[in-house]
Amino acid sequence: MKVSIVVLNFNGINLLKKFIPQLIKNSNGYDIYVVDNNSSDNSISFLKTEFPEVKIIRNKENYGYAGGYNSGLKQIDSDLFICLNNDATFLDNKSIENIVKVFEKNSSIIAAQPRIINYSNKDFYDYAGASGGFIDLFGFPFCRGRILNHIENSTSYQTTREVFWASGACLAIRKKSFESVNGFDSSFFAHMEEIDLCWRLKNKDINNKIVVIGNSSVYHLGGGTLNDNSSFKYYLNFRNSIIMLVKNLPKRMLFISLFGRFLTDLLILVFSILTLRFNVFFGLLRAYSYLTINVFKLKRVKSNNEYYKFYYCKSIFYNYFFRSKKIFSKI
């Protein structure tokens, strides 16, 4: 199996200095590519000088996460892509090898992620993926090891199991599977694109398996490109999650899911005012403004009516705030 490790970068020279040496050390000789979204901070010249073994693909502009990977992966001849954030690093070389072994042993597994641990506090999982992703009735993602903002200890959930989505912080995916659904939705730019991709793969064939690999770990710093408190980040999250629902849900579930989502977002809007979180407030308003203007442009994909086999048919918000269920094993 031909494997390529692919790192997307935009003005991340300081992150490359920190994480590329560790990646090379743990790469087991697999090809490493950096797909650069037209950086202006000398990222390219730095890589060429310091790490000539790293292969560089340069995009003409900043296409975001979705478009950047779509453009870059088209140019790479490989059977398996391991897409890694520029602010992440593998625990050791066994972590990469254990990912490859899973794909070699089971052809029905088309995408996967390692356990994603917080780089700054390794006792806890990272927000972006933890030990595998799921989604609730209203399109809110949560993780095995992270529900909303409650993050669990990283010593938990160390088994390999099937999940709904694999995190974009470290997403391993077969090239033929990626191409079978035309890759990421470039209109997302960033955020939720990996969940949408996994959902479309499930809609294409419910037998497609997406897993978290329990004996593989990545440390993720987070906020490498978009600041965690960015209003633009909240805008993308709210907008893209609703677009994802419209695209992928079975018709019979559309109304109840979108109505419940609207009510939940209304509560979030009120809460953001009361707590003076204006980044959330303006991000949410901007998302609904976009959706109102572009409502007739949203396109659906063929949905799989067996979605209930891999979809959490309840509200994670309700369980979290009204039933105090903040631990994955309790839901």
Regions from the PLM with identified roles:
Residues 203-300, 305-315:
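Active-site-adjacent helix/loop segment of glycosyltransferases
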Residues 137-143, 148-173, 195-197, 226-228, ...:
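A recurrent flexible, glycine/aromatic-enriched loop bordering the glycosyltransferase active site
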